[in-house]
Amino acid sequence: MEINHLEKINSKVVSYGAKLLPVVKNRTNDEIKFLYDFGFREFAENRLEDFKQHKEVYGDVNYHFIAPIQSRKLSEISQNFTYIHTISRVKEVDILGSLERNCHYLIQVNIDND
């Protein structure tokens, strides 16, 4: 992505009081560095393994987890991510309630019974 294009998009989004959240899954190190150098300090990731590689390079970034969660990985995810966007089951809420973590959670609620 060209920097001018990104600047225009980001400026428009910010003018509405929102912010862009780059999803870095399947991105190369050069692409992530471009976003980091642009000034982004929050990235979204959907794989714990990929996050670990990114965290080594970009340790001052807040990370958002954006994939369905496996209960057995929930503790590790909550330790490493600032936000979890994909809480969708009561079991996950119960597990998170038993953990003492400083993580923000976004809960998906299905109101259509799908």
What residue spans do the PLM features occupy?
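Conserved alpha/beta-domain cores
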Residues: 1-114
